[in-house]
Amino acid sequence: KNPAGTNWYHSHTHELTGAQVYQGLAGMIIISDDVEQKLELPSGEYDLPIIIQDRNFTHDNQLSFNLRRHDRMRGFLGNSILVNGQVNSLIPVKTRAYRLRILNGSNARIYKLGWNDGTAITAIGTDGGLLEKPQNLPYVMLAPAERVELWVDFSGRKPGSELILQSLTYQGTHSTMGRGMMGNGSMR
C-alpha cells in the first residue's frame, strides 16, 4: 500500500515524453491513507491541487513546441506561466486554512515560491509524502517534476484582500541558469 502523498503521472514514451507532457498527457494523483486522515488536514474544497507549467504561445495564441538544439539538451523555457492551465490564474479562497498541493509541471523552469508580503511558507509535505513536522520557510525551491504541500491559513486576512504566491527571482547555480530560468508568473 502506498503512503499518502501528492504524485503525478506522465508519458514515458521514448523520445516523446516532453512533447506529450507539453500537450497535456500528465496530471496529479493524490493518495490518502489512515495516518494522513487522522491529522485532520484541510480536505475537500480546502485541499487545492495546483499545477504550474510554462508554455510557449505563438502570436495567434497557439501552443508551440518547436525545440531548438539548446532546448533539446537542457529543456525549454516557455514565454508564459500557467497555473492549472490558465495564465494569470486567480484562486478565490475563504478565510480559513487550506492545503495547497503544488506540482512543477514545467520542462526545465525552476521556481522559487514565496508569498508577496513575506509571510513564511509552511511546508507540510514533499515528493516523499508528509513531513514529520511542518517547516516554516521564507520560500521553497521547486524543480521540474517536484511537488510540495503547503498549509496556509487565511483566517486572519480581510475578505477581498490578496495574498500572492509568486515565483521570486534568484541566481542560478551555473552560468546559463540565471538567464531566463526565473519564473515571473504568480498565483493569486
What is each residue range found by the language model?
Residues 4-6, 22-24, 45, 76, ...:
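Short, solvent-exposed loop/turn segments at the edges of secondary structure
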Residues 31-33, 52-56, 117, 154-156:
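Non-catalytic surface loops within mature trypsin-like serine protease
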Residues 19-20, 39-40, 59-61, 110-113, ...:
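Short helix/loop capping segments that flank catalytic or ligand/cofactor-binding pockets
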Residues 1, 12-13, 34, 55, ...:
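Short, surface-exposed secondary-structure boundary micro-motifs
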Residues 1-38:
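Hydrophobic or amphipathic alpha-helical targeting/insertion segments
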